[in-house]
């Protein structure tokens, strides 16, 4: 039988009630969210209440096919999964190239939603007739590879399976399909929490035919030609994604010893070329695929194994000080059988090794030694011994034992194998990515390091390209196809391909919006239109990608995600790499505001009501109030001279307000009583920037002296390290306490008095600002009486303006 375009049928299974029903996808939702990831998020947005337990029976697990699946579109053998992560506590989306997607699609279904919890271990058997529930107690406890072999009795079958890590609800457990994985964020733990060992789909009952076959074939031919001549995709075909080792090592961004270094002379031993020669590799990849990046190889003992992907090589190799490819292959294979994410596993092992060096833990694990690693991985998967704690991730470990500054994670998800200190755009992308430190949300490091088109050590143009690639990749993961196709589709069209590299680079760096206009991503939208019959151009497709990305962010804000979470580990903000004489760090906060503006977020990183309306996203109690504040965001000064002038005026006014508050507010008076007479302190921008000088006179009065000390020595100087930090502070996007915690301030002189001054500044901000702003600017908003607040505010303003 044939399906023209797509079936638009989705199964919804409740394991608690053993109930199955069918959902129809409407054309409006198809056009707005495309499919796969986008539709999965929309379905969960309509069903998930904020704050649910990711491992509770109310969580949903969505497996979603895109419209390209089954059509023969290049690299279209991928599907998406969406749930709430037990590792991060926020939304989790993932992509996989295993055989399950094709099997479910050709069984006649575009997706599967699973909720509830089975009383006993169960497997789902799906064919064109529907769903059967089968007892899985016989395979419960088997590793993922063996259990999959037990169930695989037909070439038309596609299987999703968990290993011991998933059964034990380990927060970094993955789900396997063939030799591919839904790898990150603990999706396998969610499946295990439902006592669901496997899902088996028997396909082949249907074939998928595009609505416009002639147009489809024409676009497909063009897409294939682009990929066959694109240098990165050709490299991946020859050597796999571990060919990245060479350019990441030369670019100084490969993780070495828990991201302390960015390159190592021995890294070439684990490169794609070295492993191709060592293992005589052959293609073993997703179907259908034009790129053919997956490989298998034969070890010296004759055994055949999957050759590890770059991320696995980076995190289980140089990140641990290991340069033995056989060892990395062994650990990759073990993680695959146990059902555990190799990226998080490598990052956790790296953190434990460094924590041991620093005396935070007593461990035998150490950099450069494979001893104990195999046992540690097994303990993590089985939830035994210290492995039970390791499996909870680096964020949890560092909160318990210390060492947060070298816990290489964002929002709880461990970082992929690209050091952002050598790729500042990638640093911004990691910080703002919806699922955590993910390289698949946007990939500016390709332009910065692989192609050399953008200067990696500048903030210029980076927010624009992160925004563009986030929209593009959200669309790609909703259509769905492989993200590697974007290399070819973006850079192979003639207008880009034949522009001299230096001119293309200058355009990207200084006119990024123009450069993006030149990048032809219409192949994706043309394939979508040919398959579905729904007319769509590339700009509508990118808007759909923006809608998908923004919806995911909105769902995260319901779980409490805010600006404070869009950050990087201190290692990347304060420490240089051992391979970098210039000791570059990531100037993240210089890029964040521009990024928020492009996305239509407010100062706290919440999508504004206007943005949601523009994208057609319905507000379903997102956890914040938009009433009377629909598009509220601070006006941030732009341009260095304007910023200096703004800070000068603000310091002048705050100084006079502090002088006034010391006369009218009892709390401020009390704090100043602890400061001795004749004490002078200043708050200013370093080096040589605007400042305010305050003094408690011999008569006990608090006096604003001006912007310069006028000869008398200072007892205390509080210096803001740079102008951008001052802008964050004085546009009230960051409290003084947070600025101190983030090391934006330098204190010289009477350090104990600095705490008193910070408390006084907080009180003055409460007196000066309305609650909605002051609540962001101070560490803790006080419960003052209305009389004290409102009368005090009036008196402070009058005295500050008049200067008495």
Question: Where are each of the predicted segments found?
Answer:
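Short amphipathic alpha-helical segments
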Residues: 96, 143, 215, 219, ...
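Protein-protein interaction/assembly regions in multi-subunit complexes
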Residues: 1-233, 246-263
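Extended C-terminal regions of large enzymes
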Residues: 77, 152-185, 191-627
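Short, hydrophobic/aromatic alpha-helical segments in well-folded domains
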Residues: 99-100, 147, 186, 327-334, ...
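N-terminal-biased segments
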Residues: 25-63, 271-295, 681-700, 794-802
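A short, charged
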Residues: 47-50, 107, 158, 167-168, ...
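Short alpha-helix boundary/capping segments
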Residues: 92-96, 182, 190, 323, ...
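Feature captures hydrophobic
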Residues: 626-804
